[in-house]
Design a protein with these regions (language model features):
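An acidic, low-aromatic, low-complexity terminal/linker signal
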Residues: 1-164
Length: 164
């Protein structure tokens, strides 16, 4: 009986350990001087900055639409959405095409795509408070990779219209 109890304890410990060892890949992007991570499972494509068609009577952060392989996609400036200065378009500027369940595909403008990193549960700290404000409301966790902090974006907050 004692052996069975010990085995059950080990099983629970193993389950907790597996959860913390599960790894997720993130694309690290730069906005201004800050680094953010986007879960790679939500990324459909990364394309160079291109000409957009403006749409009238929409929030300022909705920069327009692009035609990508016959699909018309809205493009959001997450700099404006998050309260940064307007986008400065450079050779490093990219549009990341996100594939989201509710909204479908949507593009977000980022200053630079830096790298892909793999983070385990041990390297990610969830933000547990509900009353997030400012730029923090657009992140849901912080990851640590090679001694650097990466704010992990909450894509639902980025794409919600009410949070302009």
């Amino acid at each position: 009986m004692e052996q069975l109890s010990t085995m059950n304890s080990l099983s629970i410990a193993d389950a907790n350990n597996k959860e913390s060892l599960e790894s997720i890949q993130y694309i690290v992007i730069r906005l201004g001087d800050e680094q953010f991570g986007i879960d790679i499972r939500y990324i459909d494509n990364i394309v160079r900055m291109q000409r957009m068609t403006r749409v009238p009577k929409v929030p300022e952060y909705l920069k327009g639409v692009i035609n990508l392989r016959g699909e018309v996609l809205p493009v959001i400036s997450i700099r404006l959405k998050m309260g940064y200065e307007p986008d400065e378009i450079t050779k490093a500027t990219r549009i990341i095409i996100l594939k989201l369940e509710q909204e479908g595909n949507v593009g977000i403008i980022v200053d630079e795509v830096k790298e892909v990193v793999t983070l385990t549960g041990n390297e990610i700290e969830k933000l547990n408070y509900d009353n997030r404000d400012g730029k923090v409301r657009f992140t849901n966790a912080v990851g640590k990779h090679n001694g650097e902090l990466i704010s992990l974006l909450d894509l639902n907050m980025i794409t919600l219209e009410e949070n302009a």
